């Protein structure tokens, strides 16, 4: 086997590295409710435009 064969990885099926933010491409805290697939930073920016309201 060549060294290049060791660098190929299969795609992740679960965990933090399995999903990316659809807006910025960041891995990590993804909000998946209603199929949003946004990280929490992007969600905070676009939530009012999507119709989400912040209650105290």
Curated annotation (Swiss-Prot):
Co-factor binding comment: Binds 1 zinc ion per subunit.
Q: Extract one GO molecular function annotation from the record.
A: structural constituent of ribosome
Q: Does the keyword Glycoprotein apply?
A: no
Q: Which UniProt keywords apply?
A: Metal-binding, Ribonucleoprotein, Ribosomal protein, RNA-binding, rRNA-binding, Zinc
Q: Which Pfam families match?
A: Ribosomal_S14 (PF00253)
| Any one of the GO CC terms | cytosolic small ribosomal subunit
Return one Gene Ontology term, BP aspect.
Answer: cytoplasmic translation
- Asked whether the UniProt record includes Isomerase among its keywords, one would answer no
Where is Zn(2+) annotated to bind?
A: 21, 24, 39, 42
Question: Record's InterPro entries?
Answer: Ribosomal_uS14 (IPR001209), Ribosomal_uS14_arc (IPR023676), Ribosomal_uS14_CS (IPR018271), RIbosomal_uS14_euk_arc (IPR039744), Ribosomal_uS14_sf (IPR043140)
Cofactor(s) of this protein: Zn(2+)
The record's note on quaternary structure and interaction partners says:
Part of the 30S ribosomal subunit.
Family assignment? Answer: Belongs to the universal ribosomal protein uS14 family. Zinc-binding uS14 subfamily.
> What is the protein's known function?
Binds 16S rRNA, required for the assembly of 30S particles.
- What name does this protein carry? Small ribosomal subunit protein uS14
Q: Which organism is it from?
A: Thermococcus kodakarensis (strain ATCC BAA-918 / JCM 12380 / KOD1) (Pyrococcus kodakaraensis (strain KOD1))
Q: Which gene encodes it?
A: rps14
